[in-house]
């Protein structure tokens, strides 16, 4: 697998969870990582800040640049990108990980919450990618990665939480369009999504508490999958909507996924948006919805 040594990553929402796991995996290679996130001070319910994340990245072997940035704000994003380039000399990889979630139906979704999800998930992804693009075009193997789902248009993914689905699919539509647009520039644009729930604060605080955490995988599976994405040739590997374990199995040759499980005695819970025809690797069993009650 290609090393990310001396590569520069610009990652949104990397103060904790999936974004931090991706950053630390790159740091093990000796990468340089700009952490663009809002959490500068400790949160009562959420672990980690950009400063604690920076220390973890440095402890893992990387160089970290923590930047307070609201990705909905055009000026803040421009400053964050400019600071990254002036500090590290460029940007090789852009990871759009920041996301807002509210699993409410239409009547229960106030417009402030709707605007938050659209602003972070869709607009923020577009803005960050657009801002990084001039620098990515000068990189030797440039990648843009959205942490967003395959574009499976089945109504079941929309009926319970229309606003959230629109916002997440907005990220995926960026992949669809930008991959085609940037093909001539050799900039890869791909999406990565977990087959199962991932043990993050969103799962614990928003969705299912400690029980769902025990039925989840660790964020390291996405970190390993993202690292494998960045190892692919950007000129030819683009426009893909990847499911973590299938990609690791088919391209990375991974056959054992047990070490990613939080609790091996519990069934694995399926994530949203995974198409019905996407089958897990041999030996991986995913729980039915009825088993999650």
Question: Where on the chain are the PLM-derived regions?
Answer:
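Active-site loop of short-chain dehydrogenase/reductase
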Residues: 7, 62-63, 90-91, 136-150, ...
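C-terminal helical subdomain
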Residues: 191-192, 209-292
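The beta1-alpha1 cofactor-binding region of Rossmann-like NAD(H)/NADP(H)-dependent oxidoreductases
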Residues: 48, 68-80, 111
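Substrate-binding pocket helix/loop in short-chain dehydrogenase/reductase
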Residues: 105-106, 110-115
């Amino acid at each position: 697998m290609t090393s990310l040594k001396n590569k520069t990553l610009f990652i949104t929402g990397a103060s904790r969870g999936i974004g931090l796991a991706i950053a630390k995996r790159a740091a093990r290679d000796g990468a340089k990582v700009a952490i663009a996130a809002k959490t500068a001070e400790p949160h009562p319910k959420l672990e980690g800040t950009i400063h604690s994340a920076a220390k973890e990245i440095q402890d893992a072997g990387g160089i970290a640049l923590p930047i307070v940035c609201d990705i909905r704000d055009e000026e803040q994003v421009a400053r964050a990108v400019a600071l990254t380039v002036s500090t590290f000399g460029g940007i090789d990889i852009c990871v759009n990980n920041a996301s807002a979630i509210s699993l409410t139906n239409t009547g229960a979704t106030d417009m402030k919450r709707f605007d938050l999800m659209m602003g972070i998930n869709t607009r923020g992804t577009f803005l960050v990618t657009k801002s990084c693009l001039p620098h990515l075009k000068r990189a030797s193997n440039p990648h843009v990665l959205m942490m967003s789902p395959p574009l499976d248009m089945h109504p079941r993914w929309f009926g319970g939480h229309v606003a959230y689905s629109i916002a997440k699919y907005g990220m995926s539509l960026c992949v669809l369009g930008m991959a085609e647009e940037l093909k001539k520039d050799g900039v890869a644009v791909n999406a990565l999504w977990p087959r199962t729930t991932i043990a993050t604060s969103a799962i614990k605080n928003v969705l299912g508490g400690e029980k769902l955490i025990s039925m989840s995988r660790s964020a390291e599976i996405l970190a390993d999958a993202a690292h494998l994405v960045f190892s692919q040739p950007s000129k030819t590997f683009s426009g893909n909507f990847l499911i973590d374990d299938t990609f690791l199995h088919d391209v990375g040759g991974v056959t054992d996924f047990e070490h990613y499980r939080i609790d091996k005695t519990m069934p694995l819970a399926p994530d949203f948006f995974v198409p019905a025809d996407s089958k897990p690797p041999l030996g991986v069993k995913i729980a039915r919805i009825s088993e999650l009650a």
